[in-house]
Amino acid sequence: MIDLARIPGPIELEGEVCVIGAGAAGISLTRRLLRLGHNVVLLESGGLDYEPATAGLNAGETVGEDYYDLEDSRLRFFGGTTAIWGGRCAELDPIDLEKRDYVPHSGWPIGWEELERWYGEARPLFGLPARRPAPEDLRRAGVDLPQFDELETPLWTFDRRFNRFAWESCGDLEADPRCQIVTHATVTDRKSVV
C-alpha cells in the first residue's frame, strides 16, 4: 500500500485500470478486474480510518428529507461508508428507473433489464441469496405474511458481516502484485491517456 500522506513529492503509477474509491463498489470492481487478469490502481481519498480533515471534503447541503450531514454519512477511508452501514441491502424496483412527471430529474439512461442482470452477480458479494427474495419464499418457509391484493410486500436483505470491505478483510488485494492501493489520494481531475 502506498500512503500519499507519507510521501513528500509526486509519484508515478502504472496500471491498466484506475479505480477511484475503495468503498463497496470500488473494492468489488477491483476484485473482478484482478480476476480477469488486469493490473489495477485503487485510489482512496482517505486513509485506513476516519480523519476529520478528509471527512470535511464531503461538506455540503442535504436537501429533501431530513438526514445526517454529508460529512457524517459519507465516509472517506478504506471501506467507505460500509464502516457505519448496517448491512441493509435494497435493490431498486423497475419504477425507480422510469421517468415520472412528478419526480424532477427522474429517469435513468438504462432500463430495468440491464440493471437486473447485474444483481445476480452482486448479491454473493454481500453474502446474499443468488436471487431476490420474494414474499412467497418466506411463506413457504413458514413466515405468516399478510396477503395483499393491491400492495406489494417490500423485503430487505441484510449482510451479516459488517466489515466485509474493511481493510482487515481485504488482504487479498494487498497481497496481489497486480493491485496498487493508494490512500490519501483524493482525485480532483482526470485526463485520458488513450
Feature-to-residue mapping (PLM):
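Conserved beta-strand-loop-beta-strand element in the redox core of flavoprotein oxidoreductases
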Residues: 2-4, 189-194
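Conserved redox-cofactor binding core of oxidoreductases
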Residues: 101-104, 108-192
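Extreme N-terminal leader/targeting segments of oxidoreductases
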Residues: 1-17, 35-36
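Glycine-/small-residue-rich beta->alpha transition segments that form the dinucleotide
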Residues: 23-24, 46-48, 186
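Glycine-rich FAD pyrophosphate-binding loop
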Residues: 34-56
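N-terminal Rossmann-like FAD-binding beta1-loop-alpha1 element of flavoenzymes
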Residues: 15-42
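Redox-cofactor-proximal catalytic regions of oxidoreductases
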Residues: 60-135
